[in-house]
Amino acid sequence: MTKRILMLEDGNYFIGDAIGSEKETIGEVVFNTGMTGYQETITDPSYYGQIITFTYPLVGNYGVNRDDFESINPAVKGVVVREAAEFPSNWRNQITLDEFLKEKGIPGIAGIDTRKLTKLIRKEGTLKGILAAETANKEELLHHLRSVRLPVDQVHEVSSAKAFASPGDGKRVVLVDYGVKSSILRELNKRNCYVTVVPYNTTAEEILAMHPDGVMLSNGPGDPKDVPEALEMIRGIQGKLPLFGICLGHQLFALANGADTFKLKFGHRGANHPVKELATGRVDFTAQNHGYAVEKDSLIGTDLKVTHIELNDETVEGLAHKEYPAYTVQYHPEANPGPSDVNYLFDEFMEMMNGKEEGELHA
């Protein structure tokens, strides 16, 4: 089997077996601790520009099917696994992981010590990495890697170029696409919403002209400070419409209300993150995928209150506006992959939109 190298910007490197596309690629190396859900993870637009390391030792054992995509065209730069299953077994399986990666033009590497790599990332933080042929000159690879600046304005690359509708007979929801997962749209469809998906740079005036019952801010990749267009829009609609944000949408909501965000050392990516609801003490296990978080101290003096925290590191995981019907979560209530413990948040959004009809808004 052809050999491949994963070179990190600190000079560490790993040599393993090449899987997927043969092309060379550079990205931010991160790790995901989920035991299952690799198809949903690889196709999640929030992983734009990243090389994903799966910590679970066997990946691809149930293959890839046509139903579990979170986007049609994956935005990941590469995949790192300990072992890629060659002979998957599942009644829904259609192609192997290797075949899928080749089809989508995603390079990968297998047969390396992913535990060692994960511990390195935990110690040093996320690092730039390059996947290349094992025969490449290591000094030249390292020099090239260190000279490359990872892309910003990532949301622009994964957001819908034009608005489109997903019809339903119920509430009318505008879903602002910062890199939305298909599962979020499906959750709204399950509740019979008429969903209009709009590009990330849609203005408040354009949204209000659609006369929706509520607005949802989607997940997405990158630094929330790279999306200044969103902040003015959020300020223009909060108080006028019920608002619900997820992941990047949560961070943008915080910035729009005067709080700050920061980059986590190695992020939260997995399906087993415990989150506590402060009002009730309830603890749920959640699916998470974020490299940035809201700075807790920056919330002092704002109109936002913390509703949820992550129990491992006390990261802010939920916010609510003190006056307006608006709340956000850092985790993923739609799951996919991960537990569906917090799926009820979509129902709370529906109830909030019902409150709009009953005249409960403050605007």
Curated annotation (Swiss-Prot):
Species this chain originates from: Listeria monocytogenes serotype 4b (strain F2365)
Pathway in which this enzyme or protein is active: Amino-acid biosynthesis; L-arginine biosynthesis; carbamoyl phosphate from bicarbonate: step 1/1; Pyrimidine metabolism; UMP biosynthesis via de novo pathway; (S)-dihydroorotate from bicarbonate: step 1/3
SMART domains according to UniProt: CPSase_sm_chain
Positions of the catalytic residues: C247, H332, E334
Quaternary structure (record): Composed of two chains; the small (or glutamine) chain promotes the hydrolysis of glutamine to ammonia, which is used by the large (or ammonia) chain to synthesize carbamoyl phosphate. Tetramer of heterodimers (alpha,beta)4.
Family membership noted in the UniProt record: Belongs to the CarA family.
EC number: 6.3.5.5
Keywords (A to Z) from UniProt: Amino-acid biosynthesis, Arginine biosynthesis, ATP-binding, Glutamine amidotransferase, Ligase, Nucleotide-binding, Pyrimidine biosynthesis
Biological function: Small subunit of the glutamine-dependent carbamoyl phosphate synthetase (CPSase). CPSase catalyzes the formation of carbamoyl phosphate from the ammonia moiety of glutamine, carbonate, and phosphate donated by ATP, constituting the first step of 2 biosynthetic pathways, one leading to arginine and/or urea and the other to pyrimidine nucleotides. The small subunit (glutamine amidotransferase) binds and cleaves glutamine to supply the large subunit with the substrate ammonia.
A Pfam family reported for this protein in Swiss-Prot or TrEMBL: GATase
Span of domain Glutamine amidotransferase type-1: 172-359
Sequence positions that bind L-glutamine: S46, G220, G222, L248, Q251, N289, G291, Y292
Top EC class for this record: ligase
Region (CPSase): 1-172
GO biological-process terms attached to the record: 'de novo' pyrimidine nucleobase biosynthetic process; 'de novo' UMP biosynthetic process; glutamine metabolic process; L-arginine biosynthetic process
Protein name according to UniProt: Carbamoyl phosphate synthase small chain
Reactions catalysed according to its record: hydrogencarbonate + L-glutamine + 2 ATP + H2O = carbamoyl phosphate + L-glutamate + 2 ADP + phosphate + 2 H(+)
InterPro entries in alphabetical order: Anth_synth/Amidotransfase, CarbamoylP_synth_ssu, CarbamoylP_synth_ssu_N, CarbP_synth_ssu_N_sf, Class_I_gatase-like, CPSase_GATase1, GATASE
GO molecular function: ATP binding; carbamoyl-phosphate synthase (glutamine-hydrolyzing) activity; glutaminase activity
